[in-house]
Regions:
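Beta-lactam-recognizing serine transpeptidase/beta-lactamase-like catalytic domain environment
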Residues: 1-2, 7-167
Length: 167
């Protein structure tokens, strides 16, 4: 879930969707008009009211509303969109085995607009982008990949291949 927020924060900074001064008022929920039926509104909730949040607070306090805007767009924030979120998750190898020296390693899965159309016979909606932006929905990653990715965040960006040691 929320463990992918630092990755998407970096993507948002790189793509100039947000900068270190961008602030979003996170009052507990946002409402978005349906893309199919304009008389319907969907509510996307946060786990608490956070108030004004910049990217640092959004990562530190896991501010879902900031990441809804960062990923799917809201208000004045254009959003990364599904294609950019997919791009950065795949650049971080979220959909690939880590290469650890163990047989049968599983891969994660990064959903895309094309995958949803082909598999679920449905369009990609803003709610899908919101779910992806907080690490939910159809995204799956392995615990080992999470360790590898967070290690890269901690060590300045070097993605290390995990391995086993004797003892």
């Amino acid at each position: 879930g929320s463990t992918i927020k630092p990755l998407l924060a970096m993507a948002g900074l790189k793509e100039h969707v947000v900068d270190e001064h961008t602030k979003i008022l996170a009052e507990g929920a946002i409402q978005v008009q349906s893309e199919v039926d304009p008389s319907v509104y969907y509510t996307f909730r946060d786990w608490k009211v956070h108030g004004w949040s910049d990217i640092r607070k959004a990562i530190a306090d896991s501010v879902d509303i900031f990441f809804y805007a960062l990923g799917g767009g809201y208000g004045d924030i254009h959003g990364l969109g599904v294609d950019n979120m997919e791009k950065y998750l795949k650049l971080a190898r979220a959909d690939q085995p880590t290469g650890i020296d163990l047989p049968g390693e599983a891969s994660g899965f990064v959903p895309s607009r094309a995958w949803k159309r082909e598999t679920k016979h449905d369009a990609w909606y803003i709610g899908d982008s919101y779910n992806l932006s907080i690490g939910q929905g159809d995204l799956t990653v392995t615990p080992l990949w999470l360790n590898m990715y967070i290690s890269a965040v901690a060590n300045g960006g070097k993605l290390m291949k995990p391995g086993l040691v004797e003892n």
